[in-house]
Amino acid sequence: AAAILPAHAQKFLNDELTLSNVSLWQQGNSLYVGMTFDMSKLTIGSTRSLSLIPLLTDGQHNVPLQEIIVNGKRREKAYIRGLAITKQEPTALIVPYNKRETFNYTQIIPYKPWMSNASLQLVENLCGCGNYQEMNAQELITNDVSTEAKRLSAMSPFVAYIQPTVEVVKNRSEQYEAHLDFPVNKSVILTDFMNNHTELVNIHSMFDKIQNDKNLTIKGIGIEGFASPEGPLAFNEQLSKKRAEALKDYLVKNEKVSSKLYKVTFGGENWDGLVKALKSSSMKDKETFLNIIKNTTDDAKRKQEIMRVGGGAPYRSMLKEIYPGLRKVNCKIDYTVVNFDVEQGRIIIRENPKYLSLNEMYQVANSYPKGSKDFVNVFDIAVRMYPTDQVANLNAAAVALSQKDLNTAVKYMEKADHTTAEFMNNTGVYNFLNGDIQRAMAAFEQAAKLGNEAAQTNLKQLQQILNVKMK
């Protein structure tokens, strides 16, 4: 039967010598050389001597490793006598003629950068003693030098994801900011007055969208009235509330929603809207107005100062151009959404992603192959829908890291919970991809202690890469 050779065994010296388990492993400042010699089939004439020198070379540099000498029977006796006379220790590794079996050869030499592209050759010399013809040869053992840099670049660390908690009741809301027009000091909705028709159509379309969707159930309707900040506050509050009530009455009459679900409130004088409008306007006095609003806390005094700017003309201009837009009613519909399975979720994520909980999105993402376009897209949608959620940000960072997009990953990681094992693992991945191996190792160790499987795998891989390997 044919002999079974060790893995990656190579034949030398006309198939009489077998080498296996060859390893060139750089670690720090050292190169570890290891291989197994099988000399069981080697025959050497009694008077002859075989010299084997593993040679590390890149064509320009040569580093010969420890020589191996195999002597024939008579030659060995002469060799030993010679050593005894000179009282010298042999520098070579002597293989006794009757022990030509299998042995492990290991050497550690200082590592130099040129060695990353070197090859290991076997220089063979069988002496011409006893009237034999001398034989010289050089054969390739390997050109595979395993450097830290090569091993690290081949490693793809695993990112960690967090499965979001189940949202038992999915509460959502839609809001429309209506700028309804009322005759001066009146609070009755006239559907054909100024721009009211368009605004009311928009409110109705919001109601239709929610009421016509069998997956949604209306739970409440909030109507909040805002006033433009001129005149007495008490009067503004009273008028705004009346106008908000007018919208409620109109909707109760025209929409199929119980009046019990409506809640009317006064949102206050719309100073925020005024600041926003001023900032985007080209009024030359806008900075003066903005400073008054920012620095004058008393309501009546603030209004008086605004009226006095530039002799009153800028204020009159604002009354005409800006203030009408500040009188608004926010109409907000609160509703709940049914739960979806993965197949439904795959459709909803494209049509109306806000109807999905983060947990449902996570299930949908993981129904696609990891790292696929659809998988990545779902996590991207999740963080857009829930921009402040820590889990959504952690998972979006994980996706970015898996694509080696470090800038995007950092942006999301800042908003994630820094105390989770998943965050620690992903910090390790970030450090690894950034070339900071020691910090990566520390982060993986931290996460692995907390039981994170991705970190345990990453740590094991990194330890294998960085550990000394001697065959």
Residue ranges and their predicted role:
Residues 1-471:
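N-terminal targeting segments with Sec-dependent signals, encompassing both cleavable signal peptides
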